Amino acid sequence: MTKDIHQHRILILDFGSQYTQLIARRVREIGVYCELWAWDVTEEQMREFNPSGIILSGGPESVTEAGSPRAPEYVFNAGVPVFGICYGMQTMAEQLGGKVQSSTEREFGYAKVEVLGNSGKTSALLRNIEDAIADNGNALLDVWMSHGDKVTTIPADFTTIAQTATCPHAAMANEAKRFYGVQFHPEVTHTRQGARMLEHFVKDICGCECLWTPATIIDDAVARIREQVGDDEVILGLSGGVDSSVVAMLVHRAIGDRLTCVFVDNGLLRLNEGQQVMEMFGDHFGLNIVKVDAEERFLSALAGEDEPEAKRKIIGRVFVEVFDDEAKKLKNARWLAQGTIYPDVIESAASKTGKAHVIKSHHNVGGLPEEMKMGLVEPLRELFKDEVRRVGLELGLPYDMLYRHPFPGPGLGVRVLGEVKKEYCDLLRKADAVFIEELRKADLYNQVSQAFAVFLPVRSVGVMGDGRKYDWVIALRAVETIDFMTAHWAHLPYDFLGHVSNRIINEINGISRVVYDVSGKPPATIEWE
């Protein structure tokens, strides 16, 4: 009998750290299922979840301030291992009888942690982990710190297992109860041995089996889809993006031709994208796809509108209308498949303290009219984006499609600045295709996180041969980022940029000038609109 891939599970309580989702991704990478909940979870909810272990995340608040978040008391009475990270360690120490105070010496960035005494051999968390050896024989670890407060007195029955020059209790442990705390962040790559610490906690201390893999995720999703929809038919809005493509493959594997994919060509796609989607999913994979040519409908709705948020809302509204029209033709479709992923679920979860993330509006079919009365099939709702990509590879989708740069939901509608016209979209499509083609040829595409062209609705004088021309301007944008929350503009070679500019101006009639965007985020956003 196949094992339940959710059988061993870790609960991560979120105290507001920017790295909390990273903790969950690291646990998943180990091969163990986990969920991320707000810190104010009830005992009943935790009992129902029945975790094999609990991780307390970092957070921006101070344990020394009244009203700051605390872990539910049940965390320390549940009889399972607990791992406190940064703020998580501080609230653990304070709640179990230790002391925390604000420090005059804040630690931000790299630090060297010394593993004390015999802890490098006896501590289940830090056993046999080292980056270097100190003169006294103790293990040294390169870690990433981000804290102002620090633990000054550890609780009774705890021992200090690591320290820094300014932080006397950089890590603490109660080996009998399997409680551990570290003042640094093992989830970030800057902490070189962080993945091994998390693996020690999840596998060795919590005893979790590695049941969470792309292959087992697929088997589980297929079984769930079959159980959920029975003999009914399913409809899916297929965009050709990563999420909807993986959903299409999963649902098709589960129910075959009872899935109908609706591909809406809104006239705001990249060059030849509609043709590529139809060839890949229709011809190659044999999915049942209905293609709707709705370019005129979208462009008519956008005519005269130049405000970015209004354009986004128009594109979202018209998509819903077009999709609704097609769905009504499929009389037997009882279910709607969507590409909701786990970060969407997290961001939409409201904490009773009001400290959860804000709900995002997505440009998918989530806003379909209530009268459609369809059930939702969301096979990716437990997965992070990197997991979706790995599942896609396992399903046979091409690497280049799964790992291509992000493309906004409204498409070229927010890369044509101001009013959107067919002429502008056609010029932008061609310029963008040249830029991406040259990035790939120069082996630069995978060295930047996102690259694209932007159409600027301004004319500029140019010289072609013996004549002058007065044509449009294209901006090129390329950024390097880890999380898309902040980004640096990519320092592409001057010769490369010159070559791309020459190709765009010489090969695309209607463009007279190319500029390169050297703005970081912040203060600028990655997209121009």
Swiss-Prot record:
Q: In which pathway does it act?
A: Purine metabolism; GMP biosynthesis; GMP from XMP (L-Gln route): step 1/1
Q: Name one GO molecular function term.
A: ATP binding
Q: Which PROSITE patterns match?
A: GATASE_TYPE_1, GMPS_ATP_PPASE
Q: Cross-referenced Pfam families, in alphabetical order?
A: GATase, GMP_synt_C, NAD_synthase
Give the keywords, sorted: ATP-binding, Glutamine amidotransferase, GMP biosynthesis, Ligase, Nucleotide-binding, Purine biosynthesis
Task: Cite the Glutamine amidotransferase type-1 domain residue spans from the record.
Answer: 9-211
Role according to the record:
Catalyzes the synthesis of GMP from XMP.
Put simply, this protein is called GMP synthase [glutamine-hydrolyzing]
